[in-house]
């Protein structure tokens, strides 16, 4: 979870951790939740959204999907920057 109430940063945890976090983020007056993800965690985010939509929150829809690429600094021992895919998935509660 993040400091922003309607943003979830997806990382290395299993998809079910995010499946439980998505309904919690809709508490109060939040009608939109955004999942921000990059790199190999994109598959985890997609799995979490699909599990949530089909099993627990039938009234959840995907509002917007934004894809892009970020330039990351080189790792130790590497001499050039690397490009990493990014994705933002906005979920809307109807």
Task: Locate the predicted segments by residue.
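Histone-fold modules and their flanking histone-like tails across chromatin and transcription assemblies
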Residues: 1-26
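Core residues of folded domains in eukaryotic genome-function proteins
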Residues: 6, 29-31, 85-87
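Beta-strand cores of modular interaction/reader domains in eukaryotic scaffold and signaling proteins
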Residues: 9, 34-36, 88-90
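Structured beta-strand/turn binding interfaces of compact recognition modules in eukaryotic regulators
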Residues: 13, 38, 92-94
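Charged, well-structured alpha/beta interaction segments
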Residues: 28-49, 53-54
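C-terminal edge-of-domain segments
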Residues: 63-94
């Amino acid at each position: 979870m993040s400091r922003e109430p309607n943003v979830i940063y997806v990382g290395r945890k299993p998809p079910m951790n995010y499946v439980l976090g998505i309904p919690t983020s809709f508490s109060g007056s939040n009608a939109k939740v955004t999942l921000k993800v990059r790199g190999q965690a994109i598959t985890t985010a997609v799995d979490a959204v699909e599990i949530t939509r089909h099993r627990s929150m039938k009234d959840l829809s995907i509002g917007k999907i934004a894809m892009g690429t970020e330039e990351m600094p080189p790792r130790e021992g590497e001499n050039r920057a690397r490009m990493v895919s990014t994705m933002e998935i906005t979920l809307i509660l109807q």
